[in-house]
């Protein structure tokens, strides 16, 4: 449950009931709820009171939360006490970003050499020394 909005976190309405309660909370909230939809959005910036000033929707549309009015299609007002209508959610793009990163790493590995390549995690000096000895022996042959 979101107690307050935090910068660089993703949020979305808890459920349809929370969205309806958000709409009932203030007369303009129906318009803002339509602009947000049930999709996740990311808080990009907040003011000193913790109110969002910039948000990005899940489809990449930047919405301003300060210095605008209700007629501006890219304006959404969210107050600090309205955080209770939203849940913090995982970054909807994280899995895609991680997969792209793994593909890039795999391409880089394939480009390096014809030798087999593997990732090794060294947790202590003994493991590092053993690995060094194995590599030293391998390359002497």
Swiss-Prot record:
From which domain of life does this come?
A: Viruses
List the keywords (alphabetical). Answer: Transcription, Transcription regulation
Q: Does the keyword Transcription apply?
A: yes
Q: What does this protein do?
A: Plays a role in the expression of some T4 genes involved in DNA synthesis including the helicase/primase gp41. May act as a transcriptional antitermination factor.
Tell me what this protein is called.
Protein comC-alpha
Quick one: which gene encodes this? comCA
